[in-house]
Amino acid sequence: MKIEYKKYTHISFDLWLTLIKSNPEFKKKRNLLFKNFFEIDSTMDKVSEVVRYYDVLGNNINEKTGLNIDTYELYYLILSALQVDIAKIDTDKLSQFYEETAALFMEYKPELIFPDTKKLFQEMTNEDKSINILSNTAFIKGRTLRKLLAHYELTDYFKFQIYSDEVGFSKPNNEIFQLVFDEINTFKSAQKKEILHVGDNSVADYNGAIRFGFDAHLLKI
């Protein structure tokens, strides 16, 4: 990962498609689990199609509103679209499914996109740069993503991690970038132009950061 970061005091990183990418087996296994867990009559192809549709739609809505659609809301939308009577499914059932999904996620872990990520973070922190994670979420909650970063031994490099499901805002909303700025200023005095946000999404990451007043690096993989 090539980033010109020397002139900044703090670097903020997106997570998905910036630092990690999905394990191709995970979504297949998750969709099969969804079908079996909720005893859905539809074909696997149909289940996969509907899950994908609401995954993309949820991300698009979050970017448009700047808010965060809850994972369980997405589950209910998918179940309803697959002709399941959601009146018969309480949130405890959804919670059980999420825990099984999280276990599957850690079994079929996302991969680090850049093998030298840990080395880069070490270099940054050695130069007294501080770093954080700022990520929108959908099907996988922030608490599970924290476990993934711990698995890759990256947690200690981050001063903090902010996930949309935990704060109720999504990029490119100014509010979530404000949370980053406020958190940075709890441990150092920093101006907006001293902060670089790195991400792959031109709307959520690049435009959002620039509009707020940070500098931004659009990562192209």
Residue ranges: model-predicted function:
Residues 1-11, 21-24, 112, 118, ...:
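Asp-based, Mg2+/Mn2+-dependent phosphohydrolase catalytic module
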Residues 3-115, 127:
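N-terminal helical cap/lid subdomain that shapes the substrate entry/recognition surface
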